[in-house]
Amino acid sequence: MTNPQFAGHPFGTTVTAETLRNTFAPLTQWEDKYRQLIMLGKQLPALPDELKAQAKEIAGCENRVWLGYTVAENGKMHFFGDSEGRIVRGLLAVLLTAVEGKTAAELQAQSPLALFDELGLRAQLSASRSQGLNALSEAIIAATKQV
């Protein structure tokens, strides 16, 4: 699709699944998890319009959401995205953490949403946000089948 250096983000590299587990583990109140999602979303760089044009706008989401990807020569996938909603940006950040730098086979072997369950995030999502998150997961799986 596009050169990944233009769609860099810290998720899956600097911010790892282990980082998120350690961050969310002490949070028992949904409001605290919500705040943490907003903070994660702030770390997600906004996509320039030219990358939004190359990325796929995901239907079924509460807010506008774009998801794109590239595949490195070693077969590892780099995903990037953006959203107009603060919470959705945070959810996208968690999703990018879960899928960044994995091969298509690795992504097909485990649900991209498994990390959300580990962090206790899916249970409190509204129906529309859950639907949007599922649409993002389906888009990732669809991307792995095109590799």
Swiss-Prot record:
Disruption phenotype: Cells lacking this gene display a high decrease in the level of ct(6)A modification in tRNAs, and show the t(6)A modification instead. They also show no defects in motility, fitness or antibiotic sensitivity, in contrast to csdA mutants.
One Gene Ontology term from the biological process aspect of the record: cyclic threonylcarbamoyladenosine biosynthetic process
Location of the active site: 61 (cysteine persulfide intermediate)
PTM sites of type Cysteine persulfide: 61
A molecular function GO annotation: sulfur carrier activity
Listed NCBIfam families: FeS_syn_CsdE, PRK15019.1
Function: Stimulates the cysteine desulfurase activity of CsdA. Contains a cysteine residue (Cys-61) that acts to accept sulfur liberated via the desulfurase activity of CsdA. May be able to transfer sulfur to TcdA/CsdL. Seems to support the function of TcdA in the generation of cyclic threonylcarbamoyladenosine at position 37 (ct(6)A37) in tRNAs that read codons beginning with adenine. Does not appear to participate in Fe/S biogenesis.
Subunit structure, as described in the record: Homodimer. Forms a heterodimer with CsdA. Interacts with CsdA and with TcdA/CsdL.
Family, similarity comment: Belongs to the SufE family.
Protein name from the UniProt record: Sulfur acceptor protein CsdE
Organism from which the protein derives: Escherichia coli (strain K12)
